[in-house]
Design a protein with these regions (language model features):
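A conserved donor-nucleotide-binding helix/loop in the catalytic core
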Residues: 36-65, 71-75, 123, 151-160
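Short, aromatic/basic amphipathic alpha-helical patches
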Residues: 17-26, 110-112, 225-231
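Catalytic core and acceptor-binding pocket of nucleotide-sugar-dependent glycosyltransferases
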Residues: 121-199, 203-230
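Generic preference for well-ordered alpha-helical elements
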Residues: 18, 44, 69, 73-76, ...
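Conserved donor-nucleotide/metal-binding helix-loop-beta segment in metal-dependent transferases, i.e.
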Residues: 71-115
Length: 297
């Protein structure tokens, strides 16, 4: 595919839908293959190094996508044109990111509590597009100003709240269609997408719809592959996908539970510091260097 966009992902191994992503997007650059995963910060560290390469000019368009659960749609042929048309109308935007949709109300509440929101809208960090210069500035700022990197989604949400004009959340699914359906099939909806085209909802001009679909939260893209690209996944591979995704879901539950617990423990601790009094003084007034305080910062 001839494109002025550099497509990049981070993956330590070739599994799940990554082989199909590479098949459908041969120019895809895979960072971190066969390397050790060191947590979510690995994504930004590897991407930062990639953006520093001599062959990457400031004006190079960079589209980052998650490796294991994202695939291109047929609309990708209009992706570059739609992006440039959008930026023409929104020059302050440094990055377009996905908008995460969840069917389950409880799931949505937990996601908002863990990852945070931007004006009550929840972005998804698993796909974004912008110039190399702008992406580099965003990533460098996050890495330079984050002492405790939790997940790329949490840190990007913090950035978006600080610099709201710089991050556009694709609420109309003009560029990315993101759906959180753990262990369920994700396909493009037959209705509800902006049929007027990419960016039309924000006055950017005509297009054809989202260029990528993201089965966020360990969803399946088997039905999408068959319907959109005529690619059939065997029963054996489907079983493998199911097992891999179940394992990943369990890992995420542990990781996100720890984040959730620590967040609420921090709130309780601060409440205790400022409200529990001894001899008329709060604990906060007695000692500002408590070990637990330092641990929860």
């Amino acid at each position: 595919m001839n494109s002025g966009i550099n497509y990049v992902c981070v993956a330590t191994e070739m599994k799940l839908y990554l082989p199909y992503l590479k098949m459908l997007l041969p120019e895809l650059v895979i960072l971190g293959l066969n390397e050790k995963w060191e947590g979510f910060i690995t994504k930004y560290k590897l991407l930062k190094h990639y953006l520093s390469l001599d062959e990457i000019d400031d004006d190079t368009l960079i589209c980052f996508i998650d490796a294991y659960d994202v695939l291109p749609t047929k609309n990708i042929i209009d992706f570059e044109r739609n992006y440039k048309e959008f930026i023409k109308h929104h020059p302050d935007v440094k990055m377009i990111v996905g908008y995460d949709v969840v069917d389950n109300v409880v799931h949505e509440h937990l996601c908002q509590d863990i990852f945070g929101t931007v004006d009550n809208v929840r972005l998804n960090s698993g796909q974004f597009i912008g110039s190399a210069k702008n992406i580099k500035e965003v990533i460098n700022y996050i890495l330079d100003n984050t002492s405790n990197f939790q997940t790329d989604q949490i840190e990007l949400t913090k950035y978006a709240n600080t610099f709201k004009k710089e991050v556009y959340i694709d609420v109309n699914h003009d560029f990315f269609y993101v759906k959180s359906r753990p262990l369920k099939q994700v396909v493009l909806p037959t209705t509800g997408l902006n049929s007027a085209g990419a960016g039309a909802g924000a006055g950017a001009g005509a297009g054809s719809g989202p260029a990528f679909i993201h089965a966020n939260g360990n969803g399946f893209l088997n039905d999408f592959l068959l319907k959109e690209h005529g690619i059939y996944i065997s029963d054996k591979e489907r079983i493998f996908h199911f097992i891999e995704n179940v394992k990943s879901v369990l890992k995420k539950i542990i990781i996100y539970d720890l984040i959730y617990i620590k967040k609420h423990l921090r709130l309780f601790y601060n409440l205790l510091l400022n409200n529990f009094k001894i001899n008329g003084h709060t604990i906060n007034e007695y000692d500002k260097d408590l070990p637990l305080r330092q641990e929860l910062q």
